[in-house]
Amino acid sequence: MNEKYVVTWDMLQIHARKLAQRLLPAEQWKGIIAVSRGGLVPAGILARELGIRYVDTVCISSYDHDNQRDLKVLKRAEGDGEGFIVIDDLVDTGGTATAIREMYPKAHFVTIFAKPAGRPLVDDYVVDIPQNTWIEQPWDMAVTFVAPLSGK
């Protein structure tokens, strides 16, 4: 990946609330299925904004920090997804999204960020990201001290 796109906590909340607005009215949803781990924080924000208390997870491993690898389903939520929002932070090449679509064909699949290769696989997203850009999520970063340029 050539470029980086840094996401702050504030940006993530703004984008997730924008997505929640599009998912109203909340009464149409039975619950939320968060794709672990990237979808966990966005799912919490959606659950709050939509007043949804039923939140489940599907646990799929496809990344090792910044490298994609083979998909492995560690845990799945029951059913075909009917009446559920499935949320992940990002749709990238579409590998995880394809597996999600197969598991939950009747779910409404949304992400905060979408790259061109994966866009056709989601029902809605908020932010377009170029394919060659790595997203640094706020839960993967920490604020650290940086010495002044003068060295004093």
Swiss-Prot record:
<dbReference type="GO" id="GO:0005886">
    <property type="term" value="C:plasma membrane"/>
</dbReference>
<keyword id="KW-0479">Metal-binding</keyword>
<dbReference type="InterPro" id="IPR000836">
    <property type="entry name" value="PRibTrfase_dom"/>
</dbReference>
<feature type="binding site">
    <location>
        <position position="92"/>
    </location>
    <ligand>
        <name>xanthine</name>
    </ligand>
</feature>
<dbReference type="GO" id="GO:0032265">
    <property type="term" value="P:XMP salvage"/>
</dbReference>
<dbReference type="GO" id="GO:0006166">
    <property type="term" value="P:purine ribonucleoside salvage"/>
</dbReference>
<feature type="binding site">
    <location>
        <position position="69"/>
    </location>
    <ligand>
        <name>GMP</name>
    </ligand>
</feature>
<dbReference type="Pfam" id="PF00156">
    <property type="entry name" value="Pribosyltran"/>
</dbReference>
<dbReference type="GO" id="GO:0000310">
    <property type="term" value="F:xanthine phosphoribosyltransferase activity"/>
</dbReference>
<dbReference type="GO" id="GO:0000287">
    <property type="term" value="F:magnesium ion binding"/>
</dbReference>
<feature type="binding site">
    <location>
        <position position="135"/>
    </location>
    <ligand>
        <name>xanthine</name>
    </ligand>
</feature>
<comment type="pathway">
    <text>Purine metabolism; XMP biosynthesis via salvage pathway; XMP from xanthine: step 1/1.</text>
</comment>
<feature type="binding site">
    <location>
        <begin position="88"/>
        <end position="96"/>
    </location>
    <ligand>
        <name>5-phospho-alpha-D-ribose 1-diphosphate</name>
    </ligand>
</feature>
<feature type="binding site">
    <location>
        <begin position="134"/>
        <end position="135"/>
    </location>
    <ligand>
        <name>GMP</name>
    </ligand>
</feature>
<protein>
    <recommendedName>
        <fullName>Xanthine-guanine phosphoribosyltransferase</fullName>
        <ecNumber>2.4.2.-</ecNumber>
        <ecNumber>2.4.2.22</ecNumber>
    </recommendedName>
</protein>
<feature type="binding site">
    <location>
        <position position="89"/>
    </location>
    <ligand>
        <name>Mg(2+)</name>
    </ligand>
</feature>
<dbReference type="InterPro" id="IPR029057">
    <property type="entry name" value="PRTase-like"/>
</dbReference>
<keyword id="KW-0808">Transferase</keyword>
<dbReference type="GO" id="GO:0052657">
    <property type="term" value="F:guanine phosphoribosyltransferase activity"/>
</dbReference>
<feature type="binding site">
    <location>
        <position position="92"/>
    </location>
    <ligand>
        <name>guanine</name>
    </ligand>
</feature>
<dbReference type="InterPro" id="IPR023747">
    <property type="entry name" value="Xanthine_Guanine_PRibTrfase"/>
</dbReference>
<feature type="binding site">
    <location>
        <begin position="92"/>
        <end position="96"/>
    </location>
    <ligand>
        <name>GMP</name>
    </ligand>
</feature>
<keyword id="KW-0328">Glycosyltransferase</keyword>
<feature type="binding site">
    <location>
        <begin position="37"/>
        <end position="38"/>
    </location>
    <ligand>
        <name>5-phospho-alpha-D-ribose 1-diphosphate</name>
    </ligand>
</feature>
<comment type="similarity">
    <text>Belongs to the purine/pyrimidine phosphoribosyltransferase family. XGPT subfamily.</text>
</comment>
<keyword id="KW-1003">Cell membrane</keyword>
<keyword id="KW-0460">Magnesium</keyword>
<dbReference type="GO" id="GO:0004422">
    <property type="term" value="F:hypoxanthine phosphoribosyltransferase activity"/>
</dbReference>
<comment type="pathway">
    <text>Purine metabolism; GMP biosynthesis via salvage pathway; GMP from guanine: step 1/1.</text>
</comment>
<keyword id="KW-0472">Membrane</keyword>
<dbReference type="GO" id="GO:0032263">
    <property type="term" value="P:GMP salvage"/>
</dbReference>
<feature type="binding site">
    <location>
        <position position="135"/>
    </location>
    <ligand>
        <name>guanine</name>
    </ligand>
</feature>
<keyword id="KW-0997">Cell inner membrane</keyword>
<keyword id="KW-0660">Purine salvage</keyword>
<comment type="function">
    <text>Purine salvage pathway enzyme that catalyzes the transfer of the ribosyl-5-phosphate group from 5-phospho-alpha-D-ribose 1-diphosphate (PRPP) to the N9 position of the 6-oxopurines guanine and xanthine to form the corresponding ribonucleotides GMP (guanosine 5'-monophosphate) and XMP (xanthosine 5'-monophosphate), with the release of PPi. To a lesser extent, also acts on hypoxanthine.</text>
</comment>
<comment type="subunit">
    <text>Homotetramer.</text>
</comment>
<feature type="binding site">
    <location>
        <position position="69"/>
    </location>
    <ligand>
        <name>5-phospho-alpha-D-ribose 1-diphosphate</name>
    </ligand>
</feature>
<dbReference type="GO" id="GO:0005829">
    <property type="term" value="C:cytosol"/>
</dbReference>
<dbReference type="GO" id="GO:0032264">
    <property type="term" value="P:IMP salvage"/>
</dbReference>
